[in-house]
Amino acid sequence: MSSPRFTPGQAVGNRLKARGETFEDMRVGKKVLLTWTEKWAEELSGTLGATPAPRTMFIDTFWLRTVDTPEGGITVAFAPIGAPGTIMLMEDLIACGAESFVGVGASGGLDPNHPVGDVLIPNAVKILDEGTSVHYPDQGDPTGDQEMIKTLSVLIEKHGGRTASGDWWTTDGFYREMTDDIALHMENGILGIDIETSAMYRVAQYRGVTVCNILVVSDELWIEWNYGIDFSEFKTGVTAMQQAAVEWAQS
């Protein structure tokens, strides 16, 4: 049977060695809040009191901050956009002891009932238009952890957000979200779209860790493109999403 030439643990170990560090220098919490927006990563870190920790990646663009807790610590990870870089970092963190992930990000909305500012939670990814997840064993539809979905749904609403969970679409083609595809997937009940979730959910299933993404709607795709990152509703949704993520991490 064929196997990978090298493992995430070997890769991280060699990067650490090149910096004169070892795994004992790492500070990766059991719980990880992973986000692709540096401002949000800084805000989450500030709320949690997380401090800089040694990075796993060779470059210093993408960073980690960790706060120690009796339950095993919480790490905030500023991650590369897109499935390949996100999965590289996620695999690194799992090799360093991470056990549970919440992706804190943004999404495109396909459901008119959930406009800009609503926080969507992907359940099962039905449309896989990205290329990273195919490199991992197929265990059916990549699916989020059901207990985490329930918990985070309650927390988002507790903090004043509107939320929904449902079937999902993940793509590599950020600028190729075609109108015919959007119409078809809307007919089939797809709730939203992003560029990382399917790979994150599949890796979690393969590695035996838990993950749930919470993704505020930044743009509406169902008729004309409506980009809403300057809307007050978007800012309200971001606040509720972050507060829910922090409360989950501290629980």
What is each of the regions a protein language model found here?
Residues 1-151:
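Metabolite-binding pocket within alpha/beta catalytic cores that recognizes anionic/polar moieties
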Residues 37, 108, 169-174, 199, ...:
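Glycine-rich beta-alpha junction loops
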Residues 99-100, 191, 210:
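Short acidic/polar active-site loop segments enriched in Thr and Asp
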Residues 139-188:
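Active-site rim beta-loop-alpha module in soluble metabolic enzymes
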Residues 151-159, 203, 244-251:
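Generic non-transmembrane alpha-helical segments
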Residues 198-233:
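Zn-dependent metallopeptidase/amidohydrolase metal-coordination segment
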Residues 221-251:
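His/Asp/Glu-rich mid-to-C-terminal helical/loop segments that flank catalytic regions of hydrolases
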